[in-house]
């Protein structure tokens, strides 16, 4: 194992150790909005952020606070630190929010079966619920806002197919089933003639394991020239594996989200492209739709905020657009 990889894994380990002990909490308003200051019946929203340390979810936090402040609504966000999902931490914070009588809840039910009972309890207390980026994985919410993963998977396949020559894809995902399969199955169902999936490997959703998983895939399937992962936290491992295997310029990552690591990878030649999800738009629309629900208005059960496929060709333009949006 290289010194560079050892350092990156140490950082990941530190993030995991501190995960259970710390949280991120912020409020866009010191107290619940009064009837005079709020345009709606809704006075407070709790946002259970799954990964506030991840750059795009940090953007969602920022835009959530901006939108709730604009509307005079108390907006509080909490979530674990580090870059590894901690469902139990988030579930505990949702339980607290229910006990504190928040008017509405925004959440990302990564493990739907664990979240559904809490959603039912929240609804029984009169809370409105918006889920983000998980489609119809749960049933009790009033509405869902975020990326349509089926559409995203098809778009990724089409963009890989625009590369010249045969594209042999190795997929890296957390596990079989779940939200990842929605993207992957759509990807597989829309493969252009020059794109073939040669292998699928699992890293357990642990970014400290991705580099080894990626290197093993490249060793077992040397014909691979694309490593595709929907996991935003897999980027560093994919880029490191490509470098350590001496495959820069021969193998390229196709990943998710537009984080600083992804930008560096695109500019450095380890990442071909990424799906930029619109996290700011997600957060703001979720707030606005919850307000509409509280006013008795009809809202769509799902709202697709779309993705933009980003390569070196449009990177600077998309970065400028992202800066303006947030």
Predicted regions and their residues:
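A residue-level marker of the well-folded mature domains of exported/periplasmic proteins
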Residues: 3-5, 22-326
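C-terminal motif of bacterial Sec signal peptides marking the signal peptidase cleavage site
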Residues: 17-21
């Amino acid at each position: 194992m290289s010194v560079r990889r050892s350092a990156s894994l140490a950082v990941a380990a530190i993030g995991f150790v501190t995960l259970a002990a710390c949280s991120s909490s912020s409020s866009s308003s010191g107290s619940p909005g009064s009837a005079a200051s709020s345009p709606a019946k809704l006075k407070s929203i709790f946002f259970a952020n799954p990964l506030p340390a991840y750059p795009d979810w940090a953007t969602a936090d920022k835009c959530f606070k901006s939108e709730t402040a604009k509307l005079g609504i108390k907006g509080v966000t909490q979530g674990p630190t580090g870059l590894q999902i901690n469902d139990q931490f988030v579930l505990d914070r949702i339980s607290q929010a229910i006990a504190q009588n928040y008017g509405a809840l925004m959440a990302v039910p990564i493990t739907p079966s664990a979240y559904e009972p809490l959603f039912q309890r929240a609804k029984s207390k009169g809370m409105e619920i918006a889920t983000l980026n998980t489609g119809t994985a749960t049933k009790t919410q009033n509405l869902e806002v975020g990326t349509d993963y089926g559409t995203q998977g098809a778009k990724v396949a089409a963009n890989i197919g625009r590369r010249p020559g045969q594209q042999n894809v190795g997929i890296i995902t957390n596990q079989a089933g779940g939200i990842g399969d929605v993207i992957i199955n759509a990807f597989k169902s829309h493969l252009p003639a020059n794109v073939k999936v040669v292998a699928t490997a699992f890293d357990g959703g642990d970014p400290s394991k991705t580099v080894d998983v990626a290197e093993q895939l490249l060793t077992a399937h040397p014909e691979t020239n694309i490593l595709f992962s929907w996991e935003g936290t897999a980027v560093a491992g994919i880029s490191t594996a490509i470098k350590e295997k001496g495959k820069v310029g021969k193998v390229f990552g196709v990943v998710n989200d537009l984080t600083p690591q992804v930008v560096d990878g695109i500019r450095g030649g380890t990442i071909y492209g990424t799906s930029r999800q619109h996290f700011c738009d997600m957060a703001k629309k979720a707030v606005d739709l919850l307000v509409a629900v509280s006013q008795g208005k009809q809202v769509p059960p799902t709202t697709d905020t779309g993705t933009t496929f980003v390569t070196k060709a449009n990177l600077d333009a998309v970065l400028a657009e992202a800066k303006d949006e947030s």
